[in-house]
């Protein structure tokens, strides 16, 4: 994922927000406005109270999702099925070869509050594969 986001940064295919953004309502408001104007992903580099960035709308287009999975145009479902039948083990990373490692907690991840009635901040990414009933076009 990191390499893909870096590629989008290099190519200008991702919107970048450098200013500090509050994870309580403000980040969600910026995301909502940006999604009305474009399907490009968004990278927030300065989240109030966190040393970590937030990325949003990473899978906002079929083209980007297909690129991420290494699927050609119109072959997303075939590629997805192949990947599910033949999972690849994640690489083993040796700490000395990939920079600094330290103990971490999920609490360090920035968690957004989207709406006033949300019970608490949360991390989103619920995704499932379905076909549009009338056209049969697959979508996530």
Predicted regions and their residues:
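Extended, highly charged
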Residues: 1-140
């Amino acid at each position: 994922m990191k390499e893909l986001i870096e590629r989008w940064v290099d190519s200008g295919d991702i919107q970048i927000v450098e200013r500090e953004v509050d994870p309580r309502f403000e980040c969600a408001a910026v995301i909502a406005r940006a999604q009305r104007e474009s399907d490009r992903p968004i990278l927030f580099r300065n989240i109030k109270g966190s040393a970590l960035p937030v990325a949003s709308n990473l899978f906002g287009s079929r083209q980007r999702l297909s690129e991420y999975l290494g699927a050609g145009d119109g072959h997303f479902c075939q590629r997805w099925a192949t990947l599910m039948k033949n999972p690849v083990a994640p690489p083993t990373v040796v700490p000395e070869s990939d920079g600094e490692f330290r103990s971490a907690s999920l609490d360090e991840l920035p968690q957004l509050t989207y709406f006033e009635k949300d019970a608490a901040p949360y991390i989103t990414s619920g995704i499932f594969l379905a076909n549009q009933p009338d056209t049969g076009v697959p979508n996530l």
